Curated annotation (Swiss-Prot):
Activity regulation comment: Allosterically activated by HslU binding.
Protein name: ATP-dependent protease subunit HslV
EC code: 3.4.25.2
UniProt organism field: Syntrophomonas wolfei subsp. wolfei (strain DSM 2245B / Goettingen)
Gene Ontology CC entries for this record: HslUV protease complex; proteasome core complex
Catalytic site: T5
Enzyme class: hydrolase
UniProt keyword annotations, A-Z: Allosteric enzyme, Cytoplasm, Hydrolase, Metal-binding, Protease, Sodium, Threonine protease
Pfam families documented for this protein: Proteasome (PF00227)
Lineage of origin: Bacteria, Bacillati, Bacillota, Clostridia, Eubacteriales
Family the entry assigns: Belongs to the peptidase T1B family. HslV subfamily.
Protein task: Protease subunit of a proteasome-like degradation complex believed to be a general protein degrading machinery.
One of the GO BP terms on file: proteolysis involved in protein catabolic process
């Protein structure tokens, strides 16, 4: 499991949002930074991505993923399959320690270096040390509130930050509208 962050993606109605907390933790007990941005817009702003894991590894993966998006003409599904395949098979890439959540207006995927490519059934996905808490909160908020995707993502991270010591309330969020 990758500690020191929580990333949540929510698709609801005409909106897809990815949100992440800002905490960077060194080791088990030192907070190094409170307001890091772990969410990026890619491919002319049509795709959003978030990472959990080593920062340098995440930047490498963002660059590789954007390259795959360009090669696929912006097709998120195809680019996600290609980055998962390359990540797993490349000797250098497979040593990278990170997870990605990538999304466009239609789909959300979790991508890992071991070859997993997961599209959630309910349009909600989370990664990182507080991921399970944020996921549970987002599912409840989605089912029992009228909040939009952005609001669900932010509120679920706030809930996770009250439980997970590696997650804080310095939240950044990116939204794509259909």
């Amino acid at each position: 499991m990758f500690q020191a962050t929580t990333i949540i993606a929510v698709r609801k109605g005409q909106q897809t949002a990815i949100a992440g907390d800002g905490q960077v933790t060194l080791g088990q007990n030192t907070i190094m930074k409170q307001n890091a941005t772990k969410i990026r817009r890619l491919y002319e702003g049509k795709v959003i991505a978030g990472f959990a894991g080593a920062v340098a590894d995440a930047f490498t993966l963002f660059a590789k993923f954007e390259e795959k998006l360009k090669q696929a003409g912006g097709n998120l599904s195809k680019a996600a399959v290609e980055i998962a395949r390359e990540w797993r098979s490349d000797r250098i890439l497979r040593r990278l320690e990170a997870l990605l959540i990538v999304a466009d207006a239609e789909k959300i995927f979790i991508v890992s270096g071991s070859g997993e490519l997961i599209e959630p059934d309910d349009g909600i996905a989370a990664i990182g040390s507080g991921g399970a808490y944020a996921l549970a909160a987002a599912r409840a908020l989605n089912a029992f509130s009228e909040l939009n995707a952005r609001e669900i993502a932010v509120e679920s991270l706030k809930i996770a930050s009250g439980i997970c010591v590696y997650t804080n309330e310095q939240i950044s969020v990116e939204v794509i509208e259909k």
